[in-house]
C-alpha cells in the first residue's frame, strides 16, 4: 500500500512538471524565427501572438477580446496574430465560422512554431516589441484578467 502511494506521488509530480508551462523564449530575449509568414510580415510592429487550437475552450473565449484588442490598439501600432496548431485546417475553419477573427490567423498544422517555444498550454500568448524582443508571455485566458492584460500591453507600447 505504501509503495503504491509512493508511486502515485512520483507519477503525479512527473505529470505536474510536464504540464507546467516552460518557454524556450523568455521576456527580454529575441523571438526565434517561427517560420510563419504572417509573423514575418509584422516585423517593426508590436505583435500580440496567440497560440490556439479548435478544441480549446479558453481559446474560444479569448477571440472576442482579441477582436476588441485589435480594434482598440491596432491604430496605435499593435498587430494581433493568432497561430492555429490544429492538425486539420478544417477544424480551425469550423471554429472560425462560429467564432470569427478580426485579426490575422496563421496556420501551423505541424505545430512547429509552438514546439520552438516549448508551449504546453492553450492558449499561450506573448507580446513582441518592434525590435523582435519578447516583452512578456501569458498562459491561459481568464475573462476577469483582460483589463490587466490590456493595461500591460498598452503600458509596454507606451500608450
Please place each PLM-identified region on the residue numbering:
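Bacterial N-terminal signal peptides
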Residues: 10-19
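Thiol-based oxidoreductase modules, predominantly thioredoxin-like and allied folds used
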Residues: 77-90, 101-110
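Short pre-active-site segment immediately N-terminal to redox-active cysteine/selenocysteine motifs
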Residues: 45-47, 51-55, 121
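Conserved redox-active cysteine motifs that mediate thiol-disulfide chemistry
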Residues: 51-68
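Thiol-/selenol-based redox modules, centered on thioredoxin-like
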Residues: 127-159
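A short beta-strand-turn-helix
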Residues: 27-47
